[in-house]
Amino acid sequence: MGNTIRAFVAFIPADRCQNYVARDLREMPLDRMVDLSGSQLRRFPVHVCSFQELVKLYLSDNRLNSLPPELGQLQNLQILALDFNNFKALPQVVCTLKQLCILYLGNNKLCDLPRELSLLQNLRTLWVEANYLTKLPEVVCELSLLKTLHAGSNALRLLPGQLQRLRELRTIWLSGNLLTDFPPVLLHMPFLEIIDVDRNSIRYFPSLAHLSSLKLVIYDHNPCRNAPKVAKGVRRVGRWAEETPEPDPRKARRYALAREESQEAQLPALPPLPPTNS
């Protein structure tokens, strides 16, 4: 359904697009997914909030800067994509969607995240890349089930020590930030499998050989004097990594992301909540 909508709205003027989308969505799709990506939306169609068994909602690549409080009716929602919009702050209503597992917030104008985000204790994947973050919000460290964190292309200079509380975290993407040192907290997270610090300003890498779960470290495009030491079998992408020609770090990242997304598609079986009569 989402692809069909995008194909049509590409030819519809922006001032008429909102009305078209509203008319098109008369009832909840059988797959419990609504994809309004690239629909030129300035306002979220409130009547979608009546689809109380909705599981996936994609609002990527629109012009949204707010969401209605009625969104809180979607208590079965597990995936919410708000990337490529105009949000300067995360709408509080998002923090009421307690079954969310995957939240995409990349390519907005976020400078921080609200404390209420800690209410999303089912969150496994959080993407906040390409925002205006100068520090990683400490509330992220309270998301105890988080497995994947993508915070690349911000202005991060360090990571909070509390990050090591996230014992389920397996993948952290920090490319394109302002790190001048390898984040010390990552040295105390032996369960990490993928670390990406590509395109930072790191001059020296400590040994990562003790990180027993590590599978891939991407450290290219840093002014480093050495390659990070890793355990046997760990793949490195960056200067001095191997004697053989090193792979393209972008391809390595895309491969890892594709692998993660295939795993994310297997959402945990959360029981649907009964619809309310409100």
Swiss-Prot record:
Residues 269-278 have a biased composition (Pro residues). The keyword Cytoplasm does not apply. The keyword Nucleus applies. It is found in: Nucleus. Its main location: nucleus. Transmembrane segments: none annotated. One of its GO terms (molecular function) is alpha-actinin binding. LRR repeats lie at residues 30-51, 52-74, 76-97, 98-121, 123-143, 144-166, 167-189, 191-213. One of its GO terms (biological process) is cardiac muscle cell development. Pfam families: LRR_8 (PF13855). Keywords: Leucine-rich repeat, Nucleus, Repeat. Residues 239-278 are annotated as: Disordered. Residues 239-250 have a biased composition (Basic and acidic residues). GO terms for cellular component: cytoskeleton; mitochondrion; nucleus; sarcomere. May play important roles in cardiac development and/or cardiac function. This is Leucine-rich repeat-containing protein 10. The gene is LRRC10.
